[in-house]
Every structure is written in structure tokens, then in C-alpha cells.
From Swiss-Prot:
Gene name of the record: MED4
Bias (Basic and acidic residues): 286-303
Region Disordered, residue ranges: 274-322
Protein name according to UniProt: Mediator of RNA polymerase II transcription subunit 4
Pfam families named among the record's database cross-references: Med4
Organism: Debaryomyces hansenii (strain ATCC 36239 / CBS 767 / BCRC 21394 / JCM 1990 / NBRC 0083 / IGC 2968)
Compartments where found: Nucleus
Superkingdom: Eukaryota
Major location (coarse): nucleus
Record function comment: Component of the Mediator complex, a coactivator involved in the regulated transcription of nearly all RNA polymerase II-dependent genes. Mediator functions as a bridge to convey information from gene-specific regulatory proteins to the basal RNA polymerase II transcription machinery. Mediator is recruited to promoters by direct interactions with regulatory proteins and serves as a scaffold for the assembly of a functional preinitiation complex with RNA polymerase II and the general transcription factors.
Entry's Gene Ontology BP terms: regulation of transcription by RNA polymerase II
Protein family: Belongs to the Mediator complex subunit 4 family.
Amino acid sequence: MIPHKKNDSSFLSVPVSRVGSTQRLNQLASHGVATGSPNAYSSIPSTPSAYVSSSLNPTKGISAGPESSNQIITKEDRDAFGKLSIVEKVNEFEQNLTNLSFKVSSFKEDELASLIGKLIELNDIICSEIGELKKHRDLGILIKGLKDDQAHLDNTSKIILKELITYRNELKKLPRLPSNKNKASVFPSPNDSKVDVNEVLKYASKLSKFTKAPPTVSNLPFQIHPNNYVWPAEDALRRGMLAMSSIKVDDIINAELGEDTLEVKEEAIKKVEDNKVESITNSPPAERRGSFGERTGESRKQESQGALDLDLFDPDEEDFSD
């Protein structure tokens, strides 16, 4: 009968654990106390109660609070984060490191050199990618600031549009001024303020039942109408005309006589006066008056003939009168 051979525990390897040294010693001490023998030692440590997050975990240190708005929240964000080149390299590095630790723990020497070479290569790539992370971080901060500015501008533009809509509604309620087509000024000119007579008549017809005196009242010329009628009374019109004529006497006289006739008369008077002045200035000088004894008989005859001519009949005057 072959005797039972006891396994030598000295040749068993201890797998690599991520538990800290102090926590591991505490676990070993508690395990020895629980078995009751200080020499009862097991090379395989117990599984830790709490999961220790790896340094290569991409979601390590991510808080789900409202302050982490630009971090991984949804499944789509996690998938997009996993497709990044640096994350893929980190995952590949972790997988190769796990394979290397397993082969070392199981004393398998095959492919150890290739795994170590891959780890070195991946380490160099990750170091170069880490240098690019700073640029991506700065760009992310810039994008976040631009998004905040865009949100602020959107809110401001919405407030401005709401105020403009309220102002437009208030302006619609105000009465409109007549449009000035000739000038680009906002204020209306005096010519634009003229109202058509037909529009005034329509407005007056809306205010009163009659636009003129009814026939029953117009047939009574001697009746005194009260002042509260829509149409004016005859005595009121007469008083108004007399008052206007007493105020503007000169204007009425000029309108009756005509300004043209007065100007013609003034021009005729000026011409007559000018002719008199010219005749006086252009007349020859008067002859020297002789003495009483110097008169001849011829001059006496001419005077006597002139006196006789005054009493004679002149046929030219008769023809002119005809």
C-alpha cells in the first residue's frame, strides 16, 4: 500500500493581490484566530469584502453630482469614451498586464518576452497620449465656456424678443399718424393735416340727425332758433358777419374797390405830375416885356383878332363832338 504523500506548501505560489499590505496582514491574523491554530496558514488569501477600484478604471473618481456636467453620465457617453485611442491603449495595457501576471504566477515562460515588449510599447504610447490629454482638457474647458456663453446669449435674446413683442403690441394700439411720402421725417407737415370735406360731412352726419335745417324749420324765416341746434341760426350768422365787417373794415373796402384800380389811379396821378414838371423845365424862357410905348400897330391887330376868334363858331369842334 502506497503511503499518502503530503503536498509541500513551500512550492505553491501566492497569486498577486491588489489588497494593501496592512489589510492583508489583518486578514491573515483574523484567519489564524478563526481556525484556532497559529500555524494554520493558507497560501490563498480570502477575497476582500469591498472591491478596490483599479487605477486604470476610466470611471474612477467620477462623481454623479451636478458639478460634473461634462463627465460620463449616460451609456452613449461611456461608449464614446471607450472608443478613444488612449482608453483603448489603457485597456490593452491592463489586459496584457493581467496575462503577464497570470503567466508569472503559473511559471509559464512562453510568450513572456512578447508580453513584456508589448507592455513597454503600450507604455510609451500611453505616455505620449498623456501629453495630448492636456490639450484636450484645455479644449474641453474652452468648449464648456462657449456653451455657457451660448446659453447666456440665448436667454438674453429670448428676453429681448419678448420685450420687443410687447412694445410692438403697445405700438399697434396707438393711433397712426398720416404717412409723409414726400419727406422722410416722422413729424407730419401742415399740408398733411388737411381733411377732406366729404370725410368731415360723414363725421358730422354720424354726430347729428340733420346735416342742414329741416324743411319745416327753413320755411319759418322769422322764427328765432335756439342756440342748441345743429345748424346755425340766421341771426347768429348776421351777427357774425357784422362783427367780422367791423373788425376788418380796410380789408373789405380794398376787396370791394380792388387793389388794381387804386394802383392805376396812383400811377395816373404820378404821370400827370411828372408831365407838368417836364413842361415847366423844357419850356423856352419868357420874352422880355416891352415898355408901354414900344407896342406897334401889328401887335394891336393880333390881339384884336384873338379876341374876335373867341366868339366865332369853330366847325372842327362840332365835327369832334359828332
